[in-house]
Amino acid sequence: MEKKRNSTTKMRLTCAIIFIVFTYLYLSCYQPDLLAVAQHALSGGMTQYNYVLFPILTTLVLFLLQCGVFAITRVKKRFHALTYFPSLLILAIITDIPTDIDTYHSLGSWCWLFPLLLILYSGIMWVIRQLEAYEPDIQKGLWLSRCTWINVLSLDVMILLVILIGNGNDVFHYRMRMESLMCEGKYQEALEVGAQSAHTDSSLTMLRIACLHKTGAMGDKLFTYPLVGGSKAMIPDSVTTKSMMWTTPKWMRKKVRGKFYYVKPLDYQLNAFLLDKKIDQFVHLVQSKYNIENDSLPTHYKEALMLYTHRRLHPKVVYRNAVMEADFQDFQTLERKYPNAMERNAALRDTYGNTYWYYYLYGKE
């Protein structure tokens, strides 16, 4: 009898450790920013998410719920992992956060699916409880008992389902992480979020542009990121381009006679022309605001001026820079090397994907 009790205790302890570690790490490392925006949206911005307390308290509450389910069902053999089902179901629901939560506050299909699953679960657990008395005794294996392995695998399957149900949209995760950092004034750190990913949307583009403006690096770094939406993505429209937690600067919200009237900062104006590939307008503005012969001119402005000089038969401005000229010649040489359009695009993206030249000739607005 004592051996049986020790074996079931080890099995239950193993499951408890797996559940607690997963729940805490899942909430504190993978989903914290989505939970932050959910709380912000549901409270109308009146409350602030606590990144330290929420994962701890939620993990504790869900574990106590499992303890309660176990106390009621007393299922402690090969189906013990199912006592974690209600806790994992709730975890799945609170992390299944829609990307439009700022405008659509609803549990969606969970309104009827949650009670239905609990009813089915109750029936299944009742049947299991009746059959458990006829189960053979737990046989200890070389390391862990067979019963322990069955429960661990069952728990892993439910954990996998939680991960699949939770919001795993990488771009949405990037956006919410950036907004959290931007709310703290950490613009440089925000620029590192998703920097190696090729995935983006207009809202992420807008956030990166705002951070580059704050750090004074828009003219040097903008086209090192994947961009979509052209100049329209520079300012939120609350539909396709928006922020959920970060408060936009006042100049983006200024109204004149009921209509929005933007007085854009200079780097916004210049890069708006570049994003829309209007290099003639860009050249006209940049030469009136900068000494274009100065080596301190931002990198993308130099690239745009070099491109303009080469693509216009009678350029109004002839930009000369030996280093930039050599780079552009190498760019053109690589272009001519690949007759196949897909191979050419891939080769140029790998080597010059962080230049304005690549964006202008191959990028999408």
Role assignments for model-derived ranges:
Residues 81-139:
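Membrane-embedded alpha-helical segments of integral membrane proteins
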Residues 1-86:
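Membrane-anchoring hydrophobic segments
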Residues 22-28, 86-97, 156-162, 338:
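Aromatic-anchored segments of alpha-helical transmembrane domains
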Residues 168-289:
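Soluble catalytic regions of membrane-associated enzymes that act on cell-envelope
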Residues 6, 74, 130-150:
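Membrane-interface anchoring determinants
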Residues 41-51, 104-112, 142-145:
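Membrane-interface segments at the starts/ends of alpha-helical transmembrane spans
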Residues 143-169:
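Internal/C-terminal transmembrane anchor helices
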Residues 251-365:
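Solvent-exposed soluble domains appended to multi-pass membrane proteins
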